[in-house]
């Protein structure tokens, strides 16, 4: 087994090993020393929409020293696809909750993460129960990733208006946190309200699983700083990652981040294949975790095409040898 070490941020002179504090908001700090976590994306679609393949890939990633496996989500895909949309309508995607539960039940240490759930399309009371159950099944290994969504056809099919989806998402996050953490859950919001109820089991992680907000829009960045333990950017090269990390730090200097959220963990799925030098460039920007595509060298239209599971396993081994090795 290869340990998840060996990729570290460069030293930062005096005070090395400590994060910088940005006006009450602790953000992954460029130049600080920390272990880079490595995750694997798409554990629920394409090749891994087959349950046996998903389990094989997750177990192999766990044995290779990967820190986490991540699902993607669309409840429905547009057909025909709009210009620039690379996921074919025929792409099989296992439901996020089903996939996380499957993988959690067949692994023991690797974290299971939703990257991301399109939160405005969900019922937050039901989703809170589902995610709490995943956290129990996984013995506290859940990372709950949420996004506002962007596919209009998906919202129309679900009967949810796209307008106001960001406000709806924030309302839902507050409601789910109440269900996870309050002794007597009560919440009064714009889109969801409840009182006189309880919901068990509570998540294994107390007071709640870590929440990650996905997206690159200014509203998503602000939401991550103000409401979440982490931020997730998808398909980003090094320059774009640097721009967004800088925007997060600027927001951190302007906000009053709730102290209980702790440091904001920065996660990125890189655009294209990686080598050690490129990983180091992301690390220098303060990125805490890289979540790799199963076919990182494929062109965008081909990234979702099913491939033999053995090819994904070989890609995992390559990362373990070239990036995770000490």
Residue ranges with predicted function:
Residues 29-106, 207-209, 314:
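N-terminal beta1-alpha1-beta2 module of alpha/beta enzyme domains
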Residues 38-42, 69-71, 112-114, 142-146, ...:
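Hydrophobic faces of well-ordered beta-strands that scaffold small-molecule active sites
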Residues 41-51, 116-125, 207-216, 265-273:
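Active-site mouth loops of central-metabolism enzymes
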Residues 49-60, 127-130, 215-223, 273-281:
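Short, acidic/polar
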Residues 70-94, 118, 235-238, 296-308:
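Glycine-rich, proline-tolerant flexible connector loops at the mouths of alpha/beta enzymes
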Residues 77-85, 101, 110, 114, ...:
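Internal, glycine-rich beta/alpha segment that forms the wall or movable "lid"
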Residues 173-176, 241-248, 300-326:
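C-terminal helical cap(s) of enzyme catalytic domains, especially alpha/beta-barrels
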């Amino acid at each position: 087994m290869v340990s998840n070490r060996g990729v570290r941020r460069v030293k930062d002179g005096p005070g090395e090993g400590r994060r910088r504090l940005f006006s009450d908001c602790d953000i992954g700090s460029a130049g600080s020393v920390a272990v880079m976590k490595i995750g694997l994306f798409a554990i629920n679609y394409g090749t891994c929409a087959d349950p046996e393949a998903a389990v094989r890939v997750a177990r192999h990633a766990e044995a290779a020293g990967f820190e986490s496996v991540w699902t993607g989500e669309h409840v429905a895909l547009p057909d025909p696809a709009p210009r620039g949309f690379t996921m074919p309508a025929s792409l099989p995607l296992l439901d996020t909750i089903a996939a996380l539960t499957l993988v959690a039940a067949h692994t023991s240490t690797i974290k299971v993460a939703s990257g991301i759930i399109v939160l405005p399309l969900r019922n937050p009371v039901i989703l809170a129960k589902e995610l709490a159950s995943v956290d129990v099944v996984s013995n506290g290994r859940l990372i709950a990733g949420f996004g506002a969504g962007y596919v209009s056809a998906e919202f129309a099919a679900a009967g949810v208006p796209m307008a106001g989806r960001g406000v709806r998402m924030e309302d839902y996050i507050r409601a789910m946190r109440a269900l996870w953490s309050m002794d007597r859950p009560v919440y009064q919001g714009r889109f969801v309200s409840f009182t006189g109820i309880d919901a068990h089991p509570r998540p294994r992680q107390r007071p709640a699983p870590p929440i990650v907000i996905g997206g690159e829009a200014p509203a998503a960045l602000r939401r991550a700083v103000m409401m979440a333990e982490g931020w997730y950017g998808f398909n980003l090269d090094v320059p774009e990652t640097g721009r967004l990390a800088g925007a997060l730090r600027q927001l951190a200097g302007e906000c009053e981040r709730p102290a209980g959220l702790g440091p904001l963990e920065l996660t990125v799925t890189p655009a294209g294949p990686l080598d050690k030098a490129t990983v180091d460039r992301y690390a220098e920007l303060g990125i805490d975790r890289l979540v790799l595509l199963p076919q990182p060298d494929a062109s965008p239209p081909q990234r979702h095409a099913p491939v033999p599971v053995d090819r994904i396993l070989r890609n995992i081994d390559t990362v373990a040898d070239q990036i995770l090795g000490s």
